[in-house]
Every structure is written in C-alpha cells, then in structure tokens.
Curated annotation (Swiss-Prot):
InterPro entries according to UniProt: SCAN_dom, SCAN_sf, Znf_C2H2_sf, Znf_C2H2_type
Organism: Pan paniscus
Zinc finger (C2H2-type): 312-334, 340-362, 368-390, 396-418
Name under which the protein is recorded: Zinc finger and SCAN domain-containing protein 4
A single GO molecular function term of this UniProt record: zinc ion binding
Amino acid sequence: MALDLRTIFQCEPSENNLGSENSAFQQSQGPAVQREEGISEFSRMVLNSFQDSNNSYARQELQRLYRIFHSWLQPEKHSKDEIISLLVLEQFMIGGHCNDKAGVKEKWKSSGKNLERFIEDLTDDSINPPALVHVHMQGQEALFSEDMPLRDVIVHLTKQVNAQTTREANMGTPSQTSQDTSLETGQGYEDEQDGWNSSLKTTQVNENITNQGDQIVSLIIIQEENSPRPEEGGVSSDNPYNSKRAELVTARSQEGSINGITFQGVPMVMGAGCISQPEQSSPESALTHQSNEGNSTCEVHQKGSHGVRKSYKCEECPKVFKYLCHLLAHQRRHRNERPFVCPECQKGFFQISDLRVHQIIHTGKKPFTCSICKKSFSHKTNLRSHERIHTGEKPYTCPFCKTSYRQSSTYHRHMRTHEKITVPSVPSTPEAS
C-alpha cells in the first residue's frame, strides 16, 4: 500500500499537483473535519499500533504518509465535502482514462474548485472512453465495454444462447456445435468504405460456471483496434501477422464462480491468429474466386481429408462461401440479427465495421477535409463524393441512355426510372387470333 501511495504522489512534481493549491480553497459551509476523525484519526491509530514494534521503517513510512496526507488535505481548514472532492479528482486523474491532465486542472481552477460546477463544465474531450470488446460465445456475439465484469458478459451471452437453443428446438433445427463456433473466431472485419482497418485480438476464455450441469462455456473475446488504412490505390506488403494476432487464454473460476474478473486482469498467452478477408460470395461456386483470396490465412481447417476445399452454401439463397465465418455473418442478414448495438442510440448493425462507421456520427468528429475548399466530412466516402464536384468526375453512367452521375444514389434512382418503362406489346396477327 505504501508503495502505491508513494507512486501516486511522486507521479508529478509537488508544485504542479492539485494538492499544492489547496490554500486557495474557500471555507465551506459544511462541518469541518476534526483531527479526532477521518484520516487524522485513522493515521494516528495506525501509528500507535506500531509504537511497540521493532520495525522502525514501518513507523517512519506511516509517519511520512501521514504528514503528506495531512499537508495535502488540511483537515483543519477544509470540510468533508472539499476533502472528498480532492480525493475524487485525484482518482480521476490517475484512473487511466484522463488524457488531458493540464486541461482538467485549468477547468478545476475555473470552476472555483467546486466539484459540482467542475462536473457540469467537464466534457468527454478530456477522457478516453473504455474500449469496446467484441465477444463470441457458442455462436452468439455482442459488444461490451472493457470495464464490464466477465461474469456479466457470460450471463448476458448465456441468455442469448438459451434463447437460440429454445428457438431452434421449436423449429427442429440442430443447434450449432462448438467446432463450428471455433471456426468463426477467425473472421477479420475490414470496411472498404469508411477508411479504417480492424486489427483483431482474439482471446479464448474457458470459464467453469455452475449452471445446469457445470458445463464449460467457451468465450472468444476480440478487442477492436482501429488503425488508418493505406492511401487509396496503394498496396501494403506487410505480413498480416505483423498487425493482427490472437491471444489464447484459459481462466477457470474457483468453486464454479467468477468473482468480478475484468478483461484487463486476464492472463494472456500469445499465439498465431486466423485472419480472413472480407465477406465474398458467388452464386455459382466458391472455386471461381479462390485465386483472388490467396492472402487469407483461414485456409486451415477448411480442407477435407483429401485436401479438397470445403465450401459453405446458404440454405436460404444461392450464395456460396469459402469460409464458415463468412456464412455465419451472411446468415445474420436473413435472420435480421443485429448483435452490434450502438450504446448511444441503441441502433443495431450486422457487422462491427458498420457500427464503427455509425459511431463517428455521435462523436461529431469530421476528420476528412477537402483539400480545395476545406470542408470537413465525417466519412471518407462523403469526402470522395464531394471532391467530384471540384473535379467534375461522374463515374456512374447509365447503360441505357448514357447519362452520367456523380453519386451512386442518384445513379440508382435514375435506373429505377428505366425499370418502370414497360416493353410495348407485340400486335396480334390474324393467325394468332
């Protein structure tokens, strides 16, 4: 404990610490903290317990910490609320989510060192929100905050698994096996329109939960990390394993329970990942585009005993897929399952890449700027469409009337006008009558 406190107080120079400015506090209307209670009483009790001890270092260390806390919090001058405000602010600064400590200090000063006014003026620009973690479990998947306890994640996904099992039993469809689920973990998501790539970290957690026969639930935890894409038209020669990796982990709970384990506390064992290309399909056969997917590393487990590549056909449409993970992602569209939910507006999406594109709207950020008129856009596709105004480019040409359009939406709207044109009927002949 002493080591942790020493680390806290030595992380910044004393003149820059908020505690050095406590002399400017105005006396609050609340009751003052007496020396006989609170930190003073606690520290004195701890010090007295070491009076008869031969360990002089422990006594000196506690005395030093007592002087630091007493000098910082000044309980004879400040009220309980002021002391609590200082402790709350200090914890906020060292909690790991604050990315602009200097800005937070300035806002603390401008608020008159009043916690309520400080909270009202504080914006999300000064903090890093918890990352979202993409979790697979027995065919079910969803996004969770990285701070969410693992117990809550498993309980939530277990309910989804039970609901799907009941639904499949009513429909007479066999439930998905764990072997099929293991193949799904290799899916890599890449959005061709929003200008971002996903580097996926795959983590497998086996937790022993005491629910209905103490069965072991298998979790696949994939943490999303966004990295800028190469410039359009460029080709990256990097090995996929340099930017994408899988982390396999096995964690078993004691006595069949999980005591609030978070994702950060799970031990990791590094291993090779299984990264695939974006979803591709063909109405005829998957063999027609095998040569275009030679960079995929998910070919393991996809071949039969004689080396013949196995394909996966959708039972509801003619599409065929090379990889099971692509088929499972495609089937979500038939079932209208949208497991990736925006935490802001609760809107659901089929793929994680679609959710990432949508979340830019809530941030209000417009990182894509036109080099000519300096107008900013939230998505790269909107910037490309806008740049065609300056260049005069109209890449979408109607095959019937040869009219060109700048935007695909306008082009498709025009094509629907041709579909409404009816083919003139052939006049009847005397023989036909």
